Regions:
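C-terminal segments that line or cap access tunnels to active or ligand-binding sites in enzymes
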Residues: 275-373
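Mid-domain catalytic core of redox enzymes
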Residues: 220-321, 389
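FAD-binding beta-loop-beta segment adjacent to the flavin cofactor pocket
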Residues: 312-318, 370-400, 404
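N-terminal Rossmann-like FAD-binding beta1-loop-alpha1 element of flavoenzymes
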Residues: 2-29
Length: 432
């Protein structure tokens, strides 16, 4: 009998399974798709391209939360050498991305007066406890002390760092928490060599030492008796276990158990989670279109880009070059094809403005609509204090992990963090 069953093989599920297996626990990972990775999955196609479900960076690189999981496993993520050539798109132009307070003081992005206001804002952020501002927006935080139209127009950049560019929507506490960690770490993001494939290969190796990964096997029911988990039922088998970690999006939990067993607050939260969506396009060219090795973020348009082949030739066959561009779709995107077409037109218009020779050089492209990009938009209502804890109240042995629960950080970091939190609780509460 396994010590734990993990439902879902994304960042959270695979990390938790690896940590538990590393500690000597027997685990079974259930994944309904044909490969591990969830929203960070990747594969090499028949032509030799490494395809990813979007491009995934890791905040704070070797000092970040993802690498903390690996350190616990006695490993390190193999990050590409840090590059300082990141760019911003603002007002239809490409700008050098400022690095640290000195960089923002010198940037021609803003007037001298606006730069000084922005530095004062950063100083205030460094002194502020995020806990005081989780329930207010970034715009609220800014307007409590400052008034400058240039800086206000630049605020989406701060929100975009945690993938919620609207300053009137994003939680100030979440932005403050992230920026304080960036300022302390002195590093922005890290790109793993070979993309996310290497991340999951390492996690799989640790799981295989004392556990199993079952692909194409969908969990149908979490078995609960007297408010205590006793196992998981799939279409193939029943897996008795004293611990179940649900590592899929929290809204899906209702499909696997009697909702009346959930605390009312958890049930309500799960039903009302707001996620983000995006359009991602992989562009292939026969020649380099830029030497940029780092990434690009949009300030006044919610766009981002990576030029993988500039830094890591393993992504493509010889003589081919890959770059991935993404643009956020409107909030509450409902699948409307005309909205996607409009977003694609906007993306390509921006590309043409900042790289006039780029699109004419494209020989192939792959479009993907990420219906769920970030499972949890970091609004005040969905900020860290308001998300459900990893340990389900009222159901012994049930844990929630992933980017929709109370982990630290943002996006994938929440998944890695929640996996560590759950593993710590399980290992401290249940001795072999």
């Amino acid at each position: 009998m396994p010590d734990a069953v993990i439902i879902g093989a994304g960042y959270a599920g695979m990390s938790a399974a690896a940590l538990l297996s590393h500690a000597g626990r027997k685990v079974v990972v259930l994944e309904e798709s044909e490969r591990v990775g969830g929203r960070a999955r990747s594969f090499r196609d028949e032509e030799g391209y490494l395809r990813e479900y979007g491009a995934h960076s890791h905040r704070l690189a070797h000092k970040g939360i993802a690498n903390e999981v690996f350190k616990r496993l006695g490993e390190e993520i193999d990050f590409l050498p840090e590059s300082k050539d990141g760019k911003l798109i603002f007002r239809g132009r490409l700008w050098e991305r400022p690095e640290g307070p000195i960089g923002f003081l010198k940037t021609p992005l803003l007037s001298i007066r606006a730069r000084l206001v922005l530095l004062a804002l950063f100083a205030k952020i460094k002194k502020t406890d995020p806990a005081d501002w989780y329930h207010r927006t970034l715009l609220d935080f800014y307007r409590a002390s400052f008034r400058n139209p240039e800086v206000e127009a630049f605020l989406p950049f701060l929100g975009m760092t945690i993938m919620c560019p609207d300053p009137n929507k994003v939680s100030a506490g979440e932005v403050i928490d992230f920026l304080k960690r960036v300022l302390a770490a002195g590093v922005g993001v890290g790109e793993p060599r070979g993309g996310s494939a290497g991340i999951f290969q390492t996690l799989s190796r640790h799981i295989d030492r004392g556990g199993e990964i079952h692909l194409r096997e969908r969990a149908e029911k979490i078995i609960i008796e007297n408010r205590r988990v006793t196992g998981v039922k799939t279409g193939r088998a029943i897996y008795p276990a004293p611990v179940v970690l649900f590592a899929a999006g929290l809204p899906l939990i209702a499909d696997l158990l009697d909702q009346t067993l959930l605390p009312a607050a958890v049930e309500k939260y799960a039903k009302n989670i707001e996620h983000s969506s995006g359009l991602v396009i992989d562009f292939i060219t026969n020649r380099p279109v830029t030497g940029i090795r780092s990434g690009i973020l949009g300030v006044d348009v919610p766009i981002w880009a990576r030029f993988q082949s500039s830094a890591d030739p393993s992504f493509t066959p010889a003589g081919k070059y890959l770059s991935t561009w993404g643009i956020m779709l409107p909030w509450h995107f409902d699948g409307d094809a005309s909205v996607v077409a409009g977003a694609e037109q906007k993306m390509k218009s921006v590309i043409s403005a900042v790289f006039p020779d780029f699109l004419p050089a494209v020989v192939d492209e792959r479009k993907m609509v990420a219906t769920v990009m970030n499972g949890n938009v970091l609004t005040p209502a969905q900020s860290k204090p308001n998300r459900p804890d990893v340990e389900c109240p009222g159901i012994e042995g049930l844990y929630f992990i992933g980017d929709t629960v109370r982990g630290d950080g943002c996006s994938g970091d929440i998944s890695f963090s929640s996996a560590m939190k759950a593993a710590d609780k399980i290992l401290s509460d249940r001795k072999p």
